[in-house]
Design a protein with these regions (language model features):
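Short, solvent-exposed recognition patches
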Residues: 37-149
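Compositionally biased non-globular segments, especially hydrophobic aliphatic-rich helices
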Residues: 14, 25-26, 117-127, 157, ...
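A short, solvent-exposed beta-edge/loop patch
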Residues: 130-190
Length: 190
């Protein structure tokens, strides 16, 4: 099952069991950009190394839950988590160029980003950038922003929004190109 490969094998009775820490020791051959504090949507879901059940629980709660079909080369999934109230699906990744975060929330990207605390710094804000066309990957056009030097992509789908954050457009786009709803990924062989 593809989702199991991407989400870890779960042997415990619930998706809320603690998982081990997953780390990556690979380092890029070029200078790593200065990390940027991601957009703060509130108290984030607790991250688990094994999160397949959490993803499917979010689906059961009618939140479309996006997961990567295959991670780009050199990437690792650090974990995922889901909170039912308020609904929030989150995954964290390490890419060769830096950390990448996927947040999925009910509503639109405009609502989610308007309600978010961007950073403690008063000068940090979202600056609109050119939209990103991912029609060839089945998800259409994504809105893009610059957030204090980092890239933010957002896409609205059926009552929820996916927000991706990472160090640069190429990195964040690489994740966006691999996304598939969890319920579809669970049905695929892999």
């Amino acid at each position: 099952m593809l989702l199991a490969a991407g989400c870890g094998d779960e042997t415990g009775p619930s998706a809320d069991e603690p998982g081990g820490d997953a780390t990556s020791s690979s380092s890029p051959s070029t200078a790593t950009p200065e990390p940027v504090e991601p957009i703060d949507f509130g108290t984030e879901p607790r991250m688990r190394e094994r999160y397949k059940k959490a993803a499917l629980r979010a689906v059961d709660d009618k939140l479309i839950t996006m997961v990567p079909t295959v991670l780009p080369d050199g990437w690792t999934a650090r974990g995922g988590g889901y909170t039912a109230d308020p609904q929030w699906w989150r995954m964290e990744f390490t890419a060769p160029t830096g950390d990448v975060v996927l947040d999925q929330l009910p509503g639109t990207s405009a609502e989610a980003l308007a309600d978010a605390e961007l950073t403690p710094a008063a000068d940090a804000e979202l600056t609109p950038a050119d939209d990103v066309d991912l029609t060839d990957w089945g998800t259409g056009t994504w809105s893009a922003w610059d957030h204090d030097g980092a890239t933010v992509l957002a896409h609205d789908l059926k009552g929820s929004t996916v927000v991706l954050q990472g160090p640069d457009l190429e990195t964040v786009r690489g994740l966006a190109e691999s996304l598939l709803p969890a319920e579809d990924a669970a049905e695929q062989d892999g």
